[in-house]
């Protein structure tokens, strides 16, 4: 289904491009490869928006959050990272092939020292659109004990077993008995 949808998108995009393409003589390009005041063609925008490795400036502190005693020069580095669109909200652009790159960075310890050292960073070599991982499902793979009365239950994250927060002795101290199905202290049945 996704393949068919992608094929239809591409076909329509190509048709639109061919229908509206204007052949003009080459004019001097501005910085960034575009002519001044030129409208970027649909196919160019469409092709450049796909999930792929793209140069991204990454803050060094994002990669090395524990190195707070240093000031880095430069403070960010250009890395190839996955970016772009997947044309389906249930998919996300993720790396499928990665490698480390070593860069020389100046590490400054204010009022003490500074030196150029080597630091390793992760680069993305290949990217792919894959189903999004459900964050909530990853954090808690167990289903809820009760939709309406979650506050009455305790759940073991290892076994997913549900047990009552209330205890039988706590209920009996109030002249009630524990209903293990609802985890409430109910009036005794006669």
UniProtKB/Swiss-Prot annotation:
Glycans are attached at residue 100. GO terms for molecular function: chemoattractant activity; cytokine activity; growth factor activity; heparin binding; protein homodimerization activity; vascular endothelial growth factor receptor binding. Residues 1-26 form the signal peptide. This is Vascular endothelial growth factor A. PANTHER family: VASCULAR ENDOTHELIAL GROWTH FACTOR, VASCULAR ENDOTHELIAL GROWTH FACTOR A, LONG FORM. Belongs to the PDGF/VEGF growth factor family. InterPro entries: Cystine-knot_cytokine, PD_growth_factor_CS, PDGF/VEGF_dom, PDGF/VEGF_growth_factor, VEGF_C, VEGF_C_sf. SUPFAM superfamilies: Cystine-knot cytokines, Heparin-binding domain from vascular endothelial growth factor. It is found in: Secreted. GO terms for cellular component: extracellular space; membrane. Growth factor active in angiogenesis, vasculogenesis and endothelial cell growth. Induces endothelial cell proliferation, promotes cell migration, inhibits apoptosis and induces permeabilization of blood vessels. Binds to the FLT1/VEGFR1 and KDR/VEGFR2 receptors, heparan sulfate and heparin. Binding to NRP1 receptor initiates a signaling pathway needed for motor neuron axon guidance and cell body migration, including for the caudal migration of facial motor neurons from rhombomere 4 to rhombomere 6 during embryonic development. Also binds the DEAR/FBXW7-AS1 receptor. GO terms for biological process: cellular response to hypoxia; induction of positive chemotaxis; motor neuron migration; positive regulation of angiogenesis; positive regulation of cell division; positive regulation of endothelial cell migration; positive regulation of endothelial cell proliferation; positive regulation of focal adhesion assembly. Pfam families: PDGF, VEGF_C. It comes from the Eukaryota. Keywords: Angiogenesis, Developmental protein, Differentiation, Disulfide bond, Glycoprotein, Growth factor, Heparin-binding, Mitogen, Secreted, Signal. Homodimer; disulfide-linked. Also found as heterodimer with PGF. Interacts with NRP1. Interacts with BSG. Interacts with CD82; this interaction inhibits VEGFA-mediated signaling pathway. The gene is VEGFA. Disulfide bonds join 51-93, 82-127, 86-129.
């Amino acid at each position: 289904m996704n393949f068919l949808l992608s094929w239809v998108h591409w076909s329509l995009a190509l048709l639109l491009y061919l229908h509206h393409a204007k052949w003009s003589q080459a004019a001097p390009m501005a910085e960034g490869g575009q002519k001044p005041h030129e409208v970027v063609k649909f196919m160019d925008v469409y092709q450049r928006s796909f999930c792929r490795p793209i140069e991204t400036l990454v803050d060094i502190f994002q990669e090395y959050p524990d190195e707070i005693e240093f000031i880095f020069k430069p403070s960010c580095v250009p890395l190839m990272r996955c970016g772009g669109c997947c044309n389906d909200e249930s998919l996300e652009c993720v790396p499928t092939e990665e490698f480390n790159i070593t860069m020389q960075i100046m590490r400054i310890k204010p009022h003490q020292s500074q030196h150029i050292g080597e630091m390793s960073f992760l680069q993305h070599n290949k990217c792919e659109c894959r189903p999004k991982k459900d964050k909530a499902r990853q954090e808690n793979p167990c289903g809820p004990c009760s939709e309406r009365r979650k506050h009455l239950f305790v759940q073991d994250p290892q076994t997913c077993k549900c047990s009552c927060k209330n205890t039988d002795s706590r209920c009996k101290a109030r002249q009630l008995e524990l209903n293990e199905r609802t985890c409430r202290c109910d009036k005794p049945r006669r």
